[in-house]
Each structure stands twice: as C-alpha cells, then as structure tokens.
C-alpha cells in the first residue's frame, strides 16, 4: 500500500505522538470510558499517543480554512457572511472502532482553545427503514451501498454546507435495528461536523441518464479511514457479538434478543456466518477499496492500538 511513490507519509505511533507538542489532555479516564465503544479498550495513554496529535492536526486545518475564508471575503469585498462548517468524514469496517474515534475527536475538538461547536452524526440514520429493506429483499444487505438513502444524505450535507440553520438528520436505534422515524437530531450551525459511517468515502455509480452526481465525500474538508487486518477485525466483531449477547441482546425489545436465547456455540456460528456473508463481503467489495481516498489512515494492531498513521501529502 505504501510504495515508494505513495501519496502518503507514514509515521509510527511513537513518531506520531511527538506531534502533540504541548497540547494538554483535557479528557479524564472516566470520560474516555464513557466515549469508547463496548469492545474498544482505548485508554488515556492511547489518547495521548494518537488522538491529541490528530486533534491538533485537524485544528490546524480548521484554522487554515478559516483564514482562507477571511481572505476570500476580503477579495470579494463581502462582509458578515458566516463560514460554513468544516466537515470531517470517518470511515472503516464494522467493528474497527470508527465510533470511538469519532466521539473522542469530537470531545477533544470541543475543548480546543477556540471553543468550537462540534457536532457528530452517523450515517446509520440514513439507512432505509427495515420495512423498505424487507420489501426490496435487502435486509441481508444492510450497510451495503444500496441499503442507504443516499439522496437524503446528500440533501442533508448540501443543506449543512449551504449554511442552513436547524437541519434535521434521522436517528437509528441499535436496539430495534431500525431507523427511528419519529426522532431526529438537529444540526444547527456547527463549526465542525463529524460524519461517521462505513459508506462515507464510497463513490456513486453514474445513473442511467449519465448525470453527474456528487459523492458524500465531496462535502468533506478532511477524511479519516480506520484500518486493520481483516482477520483482526473479524476477531473484534465476534468478541463484540459475544459481549452484546450478555448485555444489549438481553433486552426483550432488542432485534437480536433471539441470539441471547441460544447457546454460545449456536450464537457464535450465526455471528461467523453474518461476518462471512455480509460484513466481510461489504468490507472487501465496498469499504476497503475506499481507503486510498482518505486524507489520513489510522492503522490498528492488537487491542485496537494504532500502530502507524498515514497522512496524505499536500
């Protein structure tokens, strides 16, 4: 991946940690425990090693875009026009740790010196409702490109970039495994918006009439891909599944409640089949091919610890 003429500059975790400079750690261990996902053991040391430098880099990009915006306003003799949000996209496989990365970055950027308003959405809310997927016989393709209402997602991002106030985004429940039709999250003029999901770096196929259509990533000012060996992601997925059987799946309202009633051996066989026929296939066909489109790649090793960082050269 990182050949001689690669567009990326690669840093070991130790090298990357030096770029935090004197950036203070503003999160406590209890706050990090609250932010991380069930199966992600990220701790204070990992935040100091990786995420402080990343937050500092992102803040540099935000500040540079703000300076460019001000210079352009001077050039155009325009005043009192609000800068549109800086949008960060975060992609990667199921179970690789995208959500933890997104939440930690949100909190670190919120506490930056500029008192930025930082919002976070996931693209799960832009999945078609289960009723629609069932009607189209696509329930086993959840997370694949054709399971998302891309038109709705593009409309949402267009409104954000246009500076529209109080833009609503749909919410998704991991309990019912469905879009919450009667609940929305309101995004109102954030300084930074983080968009997290498996599909955010994917490109669209041209429609039959050959019209040019935008990609989700066209709206991003910076993009991150969370990466790891496929076998390791599979292991994390299965470990998460086993933990969820003992926690969230115990809820009778959970879509996956039936798995909690099975023996561990039976449930694990089902999880392995889901990984092989759905998540692995989606990773290989639709997610991994988008890795090279990211501005920065976080490459994880054992225990979800980042081993090296690849940053696209300017």
Swiss-Prot record:
**Record carries keyword Cytoplasm:** yes
Keyword list (alphabetical) reads: ATP-binding, Coenzyme A biosynthesis, Cytoplasm, Kinase, Nucleotide-binding, Transferase
The protein's GO terms of the molecular function aspect are: ATP binding; pantothenate kinase activity
Q: Which Gene3D superfamilies match?
A: P-loop containing nucleotide triphosphate hydrolases (3.40.50.300)
- Localization (cell): Cytoplasm
User: Which family is annotated?
Assistant: Belongs to the prokaryotic pantothenate kinase family.
Keyword Nucleus attached: no
Q: Where does ATP bind?
A: 92-99
Gene Ontology CC: cytoplasm
Q: What are the recorded Gene Ontology BP terms?
A: coenzyme A biosynthetic process
Task: Give the protein name, as stated in the record.
Answer: Pantothenate kinase
List the InterPro entries hit by this protein, alphabetically.
Answer: P-loop_NTPase (IPR027417), PanK (IPR004566), PRK/URK (IPR006083)
User: What EC numbers are recorded for this enzyme?
Assistant: 2.7.1.33
Catalytic class of the enzyme? transferase
